[in-house]
Amino acid sequence: MQKNADVERRQVRAGSAMMVLELTVNNHPGVMSHICGLFSRRAYNLEGIVCVPITNGETSRMWLQVNEEQKLDQVIKQVQKLPDVLGIVRHDAGHEIFTGLSAFV
């Protein structure tokens, strides 16, 4: 029975539209934890995460691959309110950061 439930979940996930959120954030310990925790508390799964330091390590660029669901707009508004989030940009699912990484999977 569990096997069928797993297959159904994968099918639902596969049918969902994906998108990429590009965040510019302050670079210090705990920032990624705060952002991931916000998604987790709202039962929102992050399908992919890439984070690299920029501007001499003072800030970081973070890309989050997520399912485009109705509640995403509300989650984005809450992410924007975090003090360490300096900017956020939405991209469609074909963003090169994740399409390039798919070659390694």
What is each stretch, according to the model?
Residues 1-105:
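A conserved regulatory-domain signal marking ACT and ACT-like small-molecule sensing domains
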